[in-house]
């Protein structure tokens, strides 16, 4: 037969084919690297060379849990604008922060969030992860009544309920020689508050004095978020991402969704019949029945889950860092404690309104908010073709700002690496220090700005002031000796921050 006359497909032919493929791919990578380094629209911006030719630099630091520090270090080394990926740049100036995230003229397209940071990995970004500006505005509009001043005042009793229970637990356990785990107890407090305020869900972490299943699952899924995001940067490796995710993390994703869906369905059926109105009330269907449409239900799941996480992780980080920096600065802690104890004759006088009158308390909270790393992702957005701090950024280029770099820059803040609450005081305050008068406070936007400004800004301040005032009115805080804690070295973050262990003693000063 004719086909038998053809020579066999021998090993030599296979070797030649493989050689051709390798040479061709090497040529492709070389020419692409040269183009990205010297001819790409972003080639004029400085930065690590490996970041200019590949996403490897980005992925390495993100997977190591050190992304905010890597970007801040690059900006410190290379200047105000740094290329951090082939098609991505980071800025450090307050003007760039305003241009990228601030409000824009209605006739201009907003800088839209990148889809790569849509943790939901589907068309339902909910609120926080929603990349489409129009859909984000619609959800934000629906939720806005839940964050009005009147609505927040109605939630204050819930806030006190959990903070008082935290104080009760510390009165019993906090004075022991070995102290208590600061991140553990703060996590429990914040997840209790957030779940109840988000959609009347009781976690009972403080009551039961143990990690609720939801929090354990959330922690287990922490690193998986970044692994998933990086797989989107390397599409050819996406099928292999399961090899890099622990079995527990994969199971966690399924369990957390199923458990949350059940809780959400229960909440929907209780519309208007709950102990207090929560943030989710505005989105519940009038018929009090879970939507039969899968897409609509998925959207509600996303929003509910994001409300819970947004009300848990940022406040927990804020509380944790504030106490840490106060303990590292005993004179500041002493000054704040005296302000609080002299302002209130008894514990019950402490409310969101009365605590807001304490200038040094607010200054300490502002300073910890400034100096802590802030958001993990840098909030990457896509340029519509616009000016950023005097430079035209072509359409399609991904931009982000580094809150950590802004805070660390001596061009923005004097003694930028030091915890100095005095920088936030007014001139008429006894502790005002004129050396901080030239600080560029426009670089301090911890809740973002413009269309994406955090809706929970006000309640976050309420929580933080009341928490710190009640804790320092009641306790003398001490860090257990012998701990070698270096935040610049030990802190890690993936989907959320992994806070280093700190043992703290809460010694009761007064009887509550």
UniProtKB/Swiss-Prot annotation:
GO terms for biological process: biosynthetic process. It comes from the Eukaryota. Pathway: Secondary metabolite biosynthesis. Heme binds at residue 454. Its cofactor is heme. One of its GO terms (molecular function) is oxidoreductase activity, acting on paired donors, with incorporation or reduction of molecular oxygen. Gene3D superfamilies: Cytochrome P450 (1.10.630.10). The keyword Transmembrane helix does not apply. InterPro entries: Cyt_P450, Cyt_P450_CS, Cyt_P450_E_grp-I, Cyt_P450_sf, Cytochrome_P450_monoxygenase. PROSITE patterns: CYTOCHROME_P450. Keywords: Heme, Iron, Metal-binding, Monooxygenase, Oxidoreductase. Its EC number is 1.-.-.-. The keyword Transmembrane does not apply. Cytochrome P450 monooxygenase; part of the gene cluster that mediates the biosynthesis of wortmanamides A and B, reduced long-chain polyketides amidated with a specific omega-amino acid, 5-aminopentanoic acid (5PA). The PKS modules of TwmB are involved in the synthesis of the polyketide backbone, whereas the non-canonical C domain of TwmB is a bonafide condensation domain that specifically selects 5PA and catalyzes amidation to release polyketide chain. PANTHER family: CYTOCHROME P450, CYTOCHROME P450 MONOOXYGENASE ASQL-RELATED. Belongs to the cytochrome P450 family. This is Cytochrome P450 monooxygenase TwmD. It comes from Talaromyces wortmannii.
